[in-house]
Regions:
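N-terminal ligand-binding lobe of clamshell/alpha-beta domains
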Residues: 1-128
Length: 128
């Protein structure tokens, strides 16, 4: 897979364990393929009954600008989803250096949002 920044992201497919560092993407995952979500930020407040929807505990990994990288690594995610604007490049780099696959979205327009999410869900989660 190639993320929105053109970086190759190697993952086992279909992805089974995801940490989302982007509140809007957390909501999209929870509503589309909830079983894969194992971690998200403290700012991921929608859907309001997240754990009820996904059917298991979703570990909170602090904020979008200060994620707990150790907690993320300990969750053994197949994929971490981040956003170029929302998350720090430093955290993405350190997660990748630790062997964690990170997909970074870059969304400036509605069209880019639709395209990015479509690719992520089709290529990463096997959702068609």
């Amino acid at each position: 897979m190639i993320d929105d920044l053109g970086v190759k992201v190697s993952v086992a497919r279909p992805v089974q364990r995801v940490v989302s560092l982007v509140p809007s993407i957390t909501e999209a995952i929870a509503m589309t393929c909830p079983h894969v979500l194992v971690g998200c930020t403290d700012y991921c407040i929608r859907p309001t009954h997240l754990e009820e929807i996904v059917g298991h505990e979703v570990v909170r990994v602090r904020g979008t600008k200060n994620p707990d990288r150790k907690a993320i690594i300990d969750l053994r995610p197949d994929l971490v989803v981040a956003n170029q604007e929302e998350n720090r490049e430093h955290d993405v780099t350190l997660l990748r250096e630790a062997g964690v696959a990170v997909w970074v979205t870059r969304i400036d327009t509605v069209e880019e949002a639709i395209s990015s999410l479509t690719r992520l869900f089709e290529e990463g989660f096997g959702v068609r």
